[in-house]
């Protein structure tokens, strides 16, 4: 029957006497050999050289300064922009430019002061709303 092809033999549906063994006489020992995994080792100097996130402070004076702010955002740096030294119309144009830039990179822009804005790339998370805190502090100072 060794020369014939049988589906039941192929799928192991028949019992073969050739494979019966005495399990009591055999001993199996599983030796665990210590293995070193060099791919799990991290150098302490490499961990210390991790790239840190930066926050850049900008105070634009002309519209072309908005390009510098946009470059910082493209380099994944958060930017705090102070508009106290620029005219209202120019500040509005810069805010429009930065809003478009932040939208294009999936970042966020948030007003944190009267003329101060925080622009962040997508690897930053802005938590909370500063205007609510400012309003609450103004209310507390009026009560006291």
From Swiss-Prot:
It comes from the Bacteria. One of its GO terms (cellular component) is cytoplasm. Residues 21-38 have a biased composition (Polar residues). Its main location: cytoplasm. InterPro entries: Cell_div_SepF, Cell_div_SepF/SepF-rel, SepF-like_sf. The keyword Cytoplasm applies. Residues 21-40 are annotated as: Disordered. Belongs to the SepF family. Homodimer. Interacts with FtsZ. This is Cell division protein SepF. The gene is sepF.
């Amino acid at each position: 029957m060794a020369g014939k092809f049988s589906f039941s033999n192929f799928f192991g549906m028949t019992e073969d006497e050739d494979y019966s063994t005495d399990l009591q006489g055999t001993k199996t020992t599983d030796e665990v050999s210590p293995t070193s995994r060099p791919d799990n080792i991290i150098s302490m100097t490499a961990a210390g050289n991790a790239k840190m996130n930066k926050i850049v402070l900008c105070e634009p004076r002309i519209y072309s300064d908005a390009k510098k702010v946009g470059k910082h955002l493209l380099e994944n740096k958060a930017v705090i922009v102070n508009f106290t030294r620029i005219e209202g119309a120019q500040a509005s144009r810069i805010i429009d430019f930065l809003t478009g830039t932040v939208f294009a990179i999936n970042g966020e822009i948030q007003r944190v002061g009267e003329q101060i804005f925080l622009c962040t790339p997508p690897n930053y998370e802005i938590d909370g709303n500063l205007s609510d805190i400012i309003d609450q502090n103004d209310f507390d100072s009026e009560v006291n």
